Amino acid sequence: MTDSIQDLLSIKLARAIANPLFPEVDSQLRSGKHIGQEYLDNYSFLADFQHELDSFYRRYNVELIRAPEGFFYLRPKATTLIARSVLSELEMLVGKVLCYLYLSPERLAQQGIFTVQEVHDELINLADETKLLKAINLRAGGSDLDKQKLAEKVRSAISRLRRLGMIHAVGDQHSGKFTISESVFRFGAEVRSGDDPLEAQLRLIREGEAATAQSLQEEKNGLKDNMDQSAVENEQYFENEENEGIA
């Protein structure tokens, strides 16, 4: 019996589960949170026991992934035994905008701090506002009330992404200010932190996943179509990870 238990539970895995950090880290991962280096203790714990914990989670038909940028998250398979949720189209679009802002020169100029309003404005610039409003309400006609509802949905999307560890609030929780985590690269897997930021930004623009004021002026109609397509491509990106969204 002892040998059988040891086959299933290695000494190092037993140490990981017995670690005081395990309950918190396990709960965060199961909720879909991405754990990066900013969570020093939890990140170090995952780095130390990555192999053992990956074997542990595979019994639930999920994988413990360490992205090229370093952050950890659980990727469910189609037969996962752990409850999961999928991001909405708007939440995915907001994630794309956050990835774009992370790469933009403005991040350095603003000491890495952005506001909810900036994300909202960038989303309106990059996407067709009419289609965004229709996504919120099919009968939306562009009234002030419709635009207010869209703004509320954007705030809700940002809150959801914050709970997933993709942004971090700065100052008072009602200030609307935050910094962006590298985990937003789940919305732009083709761009990696080793790339030159300006080159990565240009590539995003060419592929219809971001834009500048100049590119919007030059390719306004085409860009709108590309942003619509980028939402579909983003869904396919998550579906390619065992046909699922973020856990």
Swiss-Prot record:
GO CC terms in record: cytoplasm; nucleoid
Keyword Cell cycle: yes
GO BP, sorted A to Z: cell division; chromosome condensation; chromosome segregation; DNA replication
Region Disordered, annotated ranges: 213-247
Highest taxon in the source lineage: Bacteria
Compositionally biased intervals (Acidic residues): 236-247
Main location: cytoplasm
Signal peptide: none
Cellular compartment(s): Cytoplasm, Nucleoid
TM helices/strands, residue ranges: none
Compositionally biased tracts (Basic and acidic residues): 217-227
Keywords carried by this UniProt record: Cell cycle, Cell division, Chromosome partition, Cytoplasm, DNA condensation
Presence of keyword Zinc-finger: no
Subunit text: Interacts, and probably forms a ternary complex, with MukF and MukB. The complex formation is stimulated by calcium or magnesium.
HAMAP family in alphabetical order: MukE
Entry function: Involved in chromosome condensation, segregation and cell cycle progression. May participate in facilitating chromosome segregation by condensation DNA from both sides of a centrally located replisome during cell division. Probably acts via its interaction with MukB and MukF.
NCBIfam families, per database record: PRK05256.1 (NF003602)
Family, as annotated: Belongs to the MukE family.
Name the record gives this protein: Chromosome partition protein MukE
